A protein has these predicted regions:
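N-terminal export/targeting and maturation segments
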Residues: 23-66
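Sec/Tat-exported extracytoplasmic proteins
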Residues: 42, 94-98, 173-176, 180
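Sec-dependent signal peptide recognition
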Residues: 2-10
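Bacterial signal peptide processing site
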Residues: 19-21
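Short, exposed beta-strand/loop patches in secreted or surface proteins that constitute
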Residues: 30, 43, 100-106, 133
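Conserved polar/disulfide-associated segments of primarily extracytoplasmic proteins
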Residues: 58-123
Length: 187
């Protein structure tokens, strides 16, 4: 009987070791992007999802009111979603919002998107957002850069021509693609 207990204990310990050895996300505390240095301001987690916000070092670092930011979305991906599934979901979501300009594609095993959001009643700015995402050993990691561009209240109500921002979003997308990959997995 004691041999059975020892065997069960050994199996339980080895399984516990496997669980504790699963890879975890590792991200930097500071990111250099464009002309700015961004520092981690918030880190929240809900179930398997983590959300981190980095704001320029030379800013108020107010997570409720910022103009430029880098966001990380980290998902353990227990549902094993492919990049194609994530791309289809985004395209379907963006299709429901005809007022924005969006592009989603997969390039070299990365999910890329660029979105131009129009001003709203609450926010009088146009937001340019570019993202890169990868499936990793520890889950799905996504890096997003968002830049809010002020527009006057009068222009915000007139629904500005978002295609006027096409060159700027293409430039931001190129800069984000040139940024070294920032999400790693560690044990």
């Amino acid at each position: 009987m004691s041999a059975i207990k020892k065997g069960i204990t050994l199996v339980a310990l080895s399984l516990a070791g496997c669980v504790s050895q699963s890879p975890q996300f590792a991200v930097p505390d500071v990111i250099r992007f464009g002309q700015d240095t961004f520092v981690k301001v918030t880190h929240s987690q809900i179930d398997e999802m983590q959300h981190l916000l980095y704001l320029p070092e030379k800013s108020e670092k107010n997570p409720e009111n910022w103009q430029k930011g880098i966001l990380f979305f980290l998902d353990k991906n227990s549902k094993n979603q492919t990049l194609e599934q994530r791309a289809a979901f985004r395209q379907a979501s963006f299709a429901k919002k005809p007022e924005l300009e969006a592009k989603v594609e997969i390039q070299q095993n990365e999910l890329h998107s660029s979105v131009i959001y129009p001003p709203t009643e609450r926010f009088n700015n146009v937001m340019l957002e570019v993202t890169r995402g990868r499936n990793l050993a520890c889950g799905y990691g996504q890096i997003q850069f968002a830049d809010k561009r002020e527009v006057g209240k009068t222009l915000a109500k007139k629904s500005p021509n978002l295609t006027a921002y096409s060159q700027e979003i293409a430039k931001l997308s190129l800069e984000l693609n040139q940024l070294g990959w920032q999400v790693q997995c560690s044990k």
